[in-house]
Regions:
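A short, glycine/Asx- and small/polar-enriched loop/turn
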Residues: 1-5, 47-54, 63, 190-194, ...
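Short, solvent-exposed secondary-structure boundary motifs
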Residues: 33-36, 108-114, 187-189
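Helical element adjacent to the flavin cofactor pocket in flavoenzyme catalytic cores
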Residues: 9-67, 71, 75
Length: 216
């Protein structure tokens, strides 16, 4: 549906990557460069001396390092608190649905973003994915993100999301005629101004952050 569209922008050099595959590729590259990756270990403290980071304490002991990078996703705020660093970051509910198979869908189709509908659309394994970003999203676990929450889901609130879903269907009317294969709600972390937090922190030298990237 385009009769209400005033203008559009096509950015030919944009693209998307599978987050899991990209992470595994970065991990392989790091190992090739000599890095050692330790999984299933929790950081219990950030060690510092005279305003500068010296390493971390973990459930397997201490690791000395002149640099520490906080890229803990929605746990980054809690990790920062260990170092005395304040990171304005909050997890909020994010929704998307995947339709049944849709004719004409293929991997080379561009991603469509529609700010007025608070939605984005893209191909997903021969189906259409519709992602919804509410103007004011519902926060999730204000006090603390559970340490053991990983790849989990939140019970979706159909009543609250129905108006946004109906608006999203209007842009691609054919999607409303398809069945829903998956309606997903999960937490993603955002900053108040929707800008990512990247760089060295002012509170602690050599303590870097890369978080809030879902705000992009």
């Amino acid at each position: 549906k385009l009769d209400d569209v005033i203008a559009g922008f096509y950015t030919a050099e944009d693209g998307r990557a599978n987050a899991v595959d990209l992470t595994m590729s970065l991990a392989r590259g790091a190992k090739m460069g000599g890095a050692k990756i330790i999984e299933g270990v929790s950081v219990t403290g950030v060690n510092q001396d005279n305003g500068k980071v010296t390493g971390v304490s973990t459930t397997m002991g201490s690791i000395e390092s002149p640099y520490v990078v906080n890229c803990a996703g929605m746990w980054a705020r809690q990790f920062g608190e260990m170092a005395g660093v304040n990171l304005p970051l909050q997890a909020a509910e994010h929704y998307y649905l995947i339709t049944d198979d849709m004719d004409g869908m293929h991997r080379d189709l561009p991603i469509l973003e529609d700010p007025d509908s608070h939605a984005y659309y893209r191909e997903e394994m021969g189906s259409l994915m519709i992602g919804l970003f509410e103007p004011v999203a519902k926060s999730w676990n204000l006090e603390r993100i559970p340490d053991n929450f990983s790849f989990g889901e939140i019970e979706p609130d159909w009543d609250r999301m129905a108006p946004f879903l109906e608006k999203a269907y209007e842009r691609v009317p054919a999607s409303a005629e398809l069945g829903i294969r998956k309606f997903f709600c999960g937490p993603e972390s955002f900053t108040p101004d929707l800008s990512p937090l990247v760089g060295e922190t002012p509170e602690l030298n050599n303590f870097f952050v890369a978080c809030g990237l879902n705000s992009l």
